Amino acid sequence: IVFHQVTGLLNSDDECWHQVKEWVEAARVANTLFYNRLGCMGHYYSGMLDIYSDLTQQYAHFGGHIEIIEVDELSVLRKEVTDEAIKQKVAVFKESFAVQNDCAQYELERSARTSVALDALVEKYKLGSMAYYYKGAAGSENEDTISSIILGVSLLTARGIPVAGEYEIKNAQAMKIMDSFGAGGSFTEYYAMDYTEDIVLMGHDGPGHITIAEGKTKVRPLTVYHGKVGSGLSVEMSVKNGPVTLLSVVQKIDGKLFLLVAEGESVAGPILEIGNTNSRYKFPIGARKFMNDWNANGPAHHCAVGIGHIHSKIEKLGSLLNMEVVRVC
């Protein structure tokens, strides 16, 4: 019989009740995952082998429901968006983001149309998270849709419906876990190291979690997208300075999943100002050992980053889900 025990005093025992609180939080997150509806829109990125997921194993470990969605459906919903809805969504953009002066009104309205359509898609399927990617073909209707999606999916992520790019289903699950714990959960990957500062630089194009940003998230125009057709608006942010937790859902050679965790710190410093999410991270074991130990566990190159140190909560969630939890630092 699986059981979990907290030992302490009924009264005047802060540590005891801290543990009880974490178990309750973990149970709530497990329940959220069990009833979550994950939307998967588009297709995988060619040759990105570490990203591919066994959907049956996702069901087996987390429960929930996975809805396979065509980009065409979002394109159809865009046609139904009214001018007034576009106007209202542009106002939301200007309130939620620091829209840079070189962002054309046409691009804001194009992104607003897609954002309103995304809201309708989420409502139709009652989605609690999402993964998407669509390479597209130049000149197609779907190009217009997918090249104007970033602001909309960033707003969804900010309101508790985390969206992962590059059809990263495992990371959509990790982001949902982090967000359900109230830690955020932004889509990221490591891309560079600063050996002098002992820093790992991490970030990604596409959606960012604007509620855990250091300052207001900027909106910038991009003339070229990474791995997809078209051009449009993107978001630029850094994760709040302070303690952070990284989480990856990893698939083992036998097909089963486990949770990979690292705790570190988001630190101030220069980042690439290229319309992406970019942050600088320090780890207690150092940048080199972090990279070696993290990669030794075989994760995909994406992970979810959230604010605060919550390994102990994730450990309890793993116990409730009967999943191994591996801590790197």
What are these regions (language model features)?
Residues 13, 45-48, 76, 136-142, ...:
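Flexible loop/turn segments at secondary-structure boundaries
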Residues 157-273:
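C-terminal catalytic subdomain
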Residues 52, 57-62, 74, 78-86, ...:
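C-terminal and late-domain segments of enzyme folds
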Residues 1-90, 96-97:
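Cap/lid and interdomain-hinge subdomains that line or gate substrate/regulatory clefts
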Residues 88-181:
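Long, internal scaffold/assembly segments composed of regular secondary structure
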Residues 66-69, 132-133, 184-192, 327-329:
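Flexible, glycine/charged-enriched surface loops at secondary-structure junctions
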